[in-house]
């Protein structure tokens, strides 16, 4: 009988669909990259989600985040993402945590999680996620930097220790090596970062418009990278694709 996953079933078969529907994916960071990871997963058939993000949707998110519209400005990203998931698949199960994940955060992960997505932008949080994933023996894929870039064709999937060019990947290599982490699947760009234009009138440092109640306002960041619609979205969909392929290939 035809259903919303019929076209996908033609590609991966009934068993593949069943694997995706039974899979549980934890996504940390539901922004420019993470929101498209969610989109790719739910439309493919993944039916169980954990979403973690403390942020609220800001006007400046409209240029790249699929959950950002004029109607969702000021709303928690995890709640908007949950609503979108359920609009696509009403049978999905979605746990949300509106919090900023850090080493002292409570344990959210357990052995029911089949895959972890790191799409956060803080090195400390990224490292902690990898460490926890390794301890729990849960597959994880990590997004490296997608800001200050214009060429989505430069993204590659590889191990962290085979990366180059990306400044974030360089820091991650050092920190993971110091912790004895042997491998990490990542999506990164070989494009040299573009230096952002400086415009005091267009600066989040001096003209912050973060929604009321935002805990980590952009005005406190050392640098706010430039971004565009077609770069982080591609990284997110690549990540979704890697997860889906890994899940359906499992014995």
Question: Where are the regions a protein language model picked out?
Answer:
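Adenine nucleotide-associated cytosolic modules
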Residues: 1-251
């Amino acid at each position: 009988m035809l259903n919303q996953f019929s076209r996908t079933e033609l590609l991966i078969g009934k068993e593949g669909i069943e694997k995706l529907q039974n899979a549980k994916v934890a996504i940390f960071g539901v922004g420019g990259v993470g929101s498209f990871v969610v989109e790719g997963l739910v439309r493919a058939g993944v039916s169980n989600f954990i979403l973690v993000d403390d942020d609220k949707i800001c006007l400046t998110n409209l240029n790249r985040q699929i959950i950002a519209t004029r109607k969702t400005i000021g709303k928690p990203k995890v709640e908007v993402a949950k609503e979108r998931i359920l609009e696509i698949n009403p049978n999905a199960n979605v746990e949300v945590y509106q919090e900023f994940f850090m080493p002292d955060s409570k344990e959210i992960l357990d052995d029911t999680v089949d895959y972890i997505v790191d799409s956060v932008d803080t090195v400390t949080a990224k490292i902690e996620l990898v460490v926890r994933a390794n301890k729990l023996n849960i597959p994880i894929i990590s997004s490296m930097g997608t800001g200050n870039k214009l060429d989505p064709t430069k993204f590659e999937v590889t191990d962290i220790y085979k990366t180059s060019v990306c400044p974030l990947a360089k820091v991650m290599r050092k920190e993971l090596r110091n912790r004895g982490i042997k491998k990490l699947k990542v999506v990164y760009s070989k494009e040299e970062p573009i230096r952002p234009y400086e415009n005091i009138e267009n600066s989040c440092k001096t003209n912050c418009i973060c929604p009321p109640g935002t805990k980590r306002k952009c005005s406190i960041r050392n640098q706010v990278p430039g971004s565009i619609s077609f770069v982080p979205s591609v990284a997110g969909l690549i990540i979704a694709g890697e997860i889906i392929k890994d899940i359906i290939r499992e014995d």
